[in-house]
Amino acid sequence: MNEYRSSLVFATPDLPLRDDVRRLGALVGDLLAEQVSAEFLDEIERVRTTAISRRESDAPPSTLSEQLTGRQPRDAEALVRAFSTYFQVVNIAERVHRIRRRREYQRSGTDTPQPDGLHDALRRLKAQGVTLDELSQWLPRIDVEPVFTAHPTEAVRRALLEKEQLMVASLVDNLDGMRTPNERASDAARFRMALTASWQTADSSPVRPTVDDEREHVGFYLTQVLYRVIPVMYETLEHAIEETYGSVPALPRLLRFGTWVGGDMDGNPNVDAKTIAGTLDAQRRAVLDRYQKELWQLASLLSQSTTLVQVSAELTAQLERYRALLPDAAARSRPRHGDMPYRLLNDLMRARLQATLDDAEGAYSAPSELEHDLQLILDSLQANKGLHAGWFAVRRLLWRVRSFGFHLARLDVRQESSVHARAVADALGQTDWDAQDATQRAAVLGPYAAGQEPLPRVDDEGNARLDAVFAALADARTRHGADALGSYIISMAHNRADVLTVLALARRGGLVDDAGAVPLDIVPLFETVDDLRGGTGTVQDLLADPVYRQHLAARGDTQMVMLGYSDSGKDGGIAASRWGLQRAQVELLEAAAELGVRLTFFHGRGGSIARGGGKTSRALDAAPRGSVDGRLRVTEQGEVIHRKYGIRALALRSLEQMTGAVLLSSLRPRAPEPREAHWRPVMDLVAERSTVAYRAFVGAPEFMQYFRLATPIDVIERMTLGSRPSRRLGQDAALSNLRAIPWVFAWSQARAVIPGWYGVGSGLQAAVDAGHEDTLREMAQDWPFFRTFLDDIAMVLSKGDLNIAELFSRLSGDLHTRFFPLIRDELALTKAWVKALLQQQSLLQHDPRLALSIRLRNPYIDPISVLQVDLLQRWRATDGEDEALLRALVACVNGVSQGVQNTG
């Protein structure tokens, strides 16, 4: 599997990637011959050759269908897994190539740092007039917080992810130019071992993961990857500042992490008060265990003897205090360590951590106490010639404690507004609660939200469940500290009454501090196009409400608003979603400023472009002026977590890119663009008319039947991807009730990728028809928002395939002739205008590396898609009861996901 079409040209810096792909492709061939047969490998080669020829000649998929249809499920599954394995090694090779390129930049010694890194950001800031004093004043305001979620978009199981890490490690080791032939042979053998073990591991688990499984999955990235790279991130920043400005200020904490795993109740009956408590306990154990192990490693390093060097009086005094506090632990210290005060203090610090784990006497009451002990050691080492005798290693632990605390990641809780509303209606005995407008409900809720009257308790499941949740949060605040809790997010928030409802429920649940305030940041999530449009009015009403304003004063007069990229796109199409999000941020910032409140945004992005995915640096550059202001809180979902944080070097790069982008957007935001006043009405028209086209398509009679037949949504719903159901419980199969993740996932599998582009062509054409073509070209050239939008659409279009999409569409029978012509015509219109406005002859002409990556994969995805259509038709003929066909279909889903590097 190592031939390439002559038209695939690698740039000189990417030639090592070409060599790796060829070598690893040949290794996949050897694997297939060994694990299946030489005849099987020959068959794979024939299919591959046909697929490439089809692409080169633009022939219809029927040329592949003749070779692939009618296979036994087991044979089909083997063929799919063969191509999936190729994608696996190509993906790994590309990740390792990113590490190679990063090292080349670092070794080059040139004045051109790697783009989007910290060195690049700081040099750009200095060139724009930012002084070291200004930078030092801004650093304490920087707060970057990736928030990991358990959305069911990760189509690769944990056992396979671990083997991928082994393969990556062997390739990274092989980058060392000093490796001997024997060592290189050992690297290759390690890769082959992990690859073979992957082949012998089923692609997906036979059972749906539990919340505990999802917590363990996310915990893997937090404790095994990010825990290790956090200190390196700060060291890189220090080096970049020193190299740029000549000196380094004391760095505050800039990074922390959040999680939804165990706290996201929206539509998931498996998440409740018990999972909230269990998650916080598990995360506490995990991070304290890491601290104990690291202190144990430091013990042997910090062996300084008082007969040779001194220690500070403060450290000696702390050691004596701890001996009195923990006499049993002090008695266990080895006599031969009696002249090693650092080691003795280390022993007692570990004892305090164990007491913290056990909730025993002598426990640390807060992470700040552990930080204080570590700082004592650092100060003593620095004062006594110990900078090169352990100071560096101790400071690394200090950075970890500052970043992870005793909680590892802040836990958010999320629930849908209607759940709260039903509970309050039942508690108040108001059967017409939904019929009342927001103002009426807010007036009723005011006394309960203010704590002037107790919200009645009622004995029903909904109220009991919510009471238990808020009681768990109150207990968690006492047990784990305020830093362990993130925000309480209200999904499908529509008005201020939705927020006051949560405030009233929190009081009833006992989440009240000593001052009588509710110590909880309540965050409305605006998800639909209409809610984005009405979000400014909602926030204005909320901030003008005296009860809520009193609550906000206790929270530092800072309000967070979450913006939903997924459901807004599903609701009105991607153009309306993107523009609605952009306008909402501008209007919300203006409203909050007028009312004297600092507004921060929480971006609910997914992995796909349709759900807000894309490069953080470009997204922040395109964001409205003032919308960052030092703060970035963004969800990291599904396959994005693996892609960005699965490898330490790439996790470091991701953190650098986010931090650098926040620094640039905050310290030197783009200058105001007076032409935006002229551009906005044009974008209003594009969004409005694209929404009309999109809703006409998805709102047509029998569309949902078409969707369910023309995509493998029924297979996706049977897969064991996550603990949350694909639609909200107790609701029908209408599009509004289907979650955005399976919606995007299904269309990506069918290669039509409808959510990522449909309606855009109609919107652009409407603007042209209204006489705005020159304005659109100006916008594409000079407006980062519009340029980024078009670039993202171009990328989505490049990953789609109309011929394959037509095969899927024909599964819908007579509905095909009604819906597919609409897809074909809108696609042609969208492609034409995207290329015209970007002034490109072909899609992704501006990004040849990405274009090459997609072209490398497409011929290998095609056979899987053709098989998928055949298997889907046969499986449905059994009413979905043939398990062998289902297993083959699941393999197809995983294979396409590996190929397009995207799920939901």
From Swiss-Prot:
GO cellular component terms, semicolon-separated: cytosol
Cytoplasm recorded as keyword: no
Cross-referenced SUPFAM superfamilies: Phosphoenolpyruvate/pyruvate domain
Keyword Amino-acid biosynthesis annotated: no
Keywords: Carbon dioxide fixation, Lyase, Magnesium
Recorded coiled-coil stretches: none
Active site: 151, 570
Entry's family note: Belongs to the PEPCase type 1 family.
Classification via PANTHER family: PHOSPHOENOLPYRUVATE CARBOXYLASE
Protein name: Phosphoenolpyruvate carboxylase
Taxonomic source organism: Xanthomonas euvesicatoria pv. vesicatoria (strain 85-10)
